[in-house]
Amino acid sequence: VQNLYQKEFLLAQLEYDNKQTRADRKIGDYFNHISKDSKHDLACELIIELGDMDFWNDKTMDYKKQMTEVYKDQIYKLMEVVPDFKVANAVVHYDETSPHMHLVGIPVKDGYKNGMKKQVAKSKIFTKESLKTLQDKMRAYCIEKFNEVYVQNATLKKKQKGRNKDIHVNEMDGY
């Protein structure tokens, strides 16, 4: 994540700092600056899962590992759907109830008039509407790739309300 911050924000941070006449207004390291800021999240985590414990319970590890191809495709689809979410890391877990992928990334917004021109911007990138669109598109892409990899014609269960949560890092015990 720290390397991605350098890649995404260094030029904007240097431009901003060079315009500052007072040393106390200079940001220096944007990663450290945001990590000390209680108003912004340093990064966001998305979890992509297809199927539940009942579906995966009797499947072999080889069968489960075929999901790697499905999840790799999901990374590229996510970058198409949300180009302002820059993926720093993606890990697939096979050791729990069902194979699922954790993605960690930074929501980046360009074109700010105040402060740095480019900033971390979770609330601008992930709105209620954009999250609904994201989930709908990713569900369609995921089942399409699943059917291609597993040579099936499976369908998804209807979406359940209340399953998505925005969890602050301080509340993540047990996740």
Model-identified regions with their sequence ranges:
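N-terminal nicking endonuclease/strand-transfer module with a His-rich metal-binding environment
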Residues: 1-175
